[in-house]
Amino acid sequence: MSEAKFMRIIVFFDLPVITAAKRKAANQFRQFLLKDGYQMLQLSVYSRIVKGRDSLQKHHNRLCANLPQEGSIRCLEITEKQYAAMKLLLGELKTQEKKVNSDQLLLF
């Protein structure tokens, strides 16, 4: 039996914030992502590490269960190796990204 691979779920979203109710829905979605272990890469781009396909499916299902009514949300599932090969073209790594590499997990 093969060992489960570490993978990443990357969520990209564009949510309407014109009215107070829509801002509230967008904030609730962001709060869900943070509570479910996602880390913000950029504004409206969040990433979460998972181990194996079962965990990936579990978090994908949670994500789908917490979608707001409106907006555009995309999900990309990649291996940790693919994630580690991502190149930063402009700017600097966030403090957390410098401290946690693909061999480490963030524990709370």
Curated annotation (Swiss-Prot):
Name of the gene: cas2
Family assignment from sequence similarity: Belongs to the CRISPR-associated endoribonuclease Cas2 protein family.
NCBIfam families: cas2
Signal peptide residue numbers: none
Cofactors, names only: Mg(2+)
Pfam families: CRISPR_Cas2
Function: CRISPR (clustered regularly interspaced short palindromic repeat), is an adaptive immune system that provides protection against mobile genetic elements (viruses, transposable elements and conjugative plasmids). CRISPR clusters contain sequences complementary to antecedent mobile elements and target invading nucleic acids. CRISPR clusters are transcribed and processed into CRISPR RNA (crRNA). Functions as a ssRNA-specific endoribonuclease. Involved in the integration of spacer DNA into the CRISPR cassette.
InterPro entries per the UniProt record, alphabetical: CRISPR_associated_Cas2, Virulence_VapD/CRISPR_Cas2
Protein name (database record): CRISPR-associated endoribonuclease Cas2
Alphabetical GO biological process terms: defense response to virus; maintenance of CRISPR repeat elements
SUPFAM superfamilies in the cross-refs: TTP0101/SSO1404-like
Organism field: Neisseria meningitidis serogroup C (strain 8013)
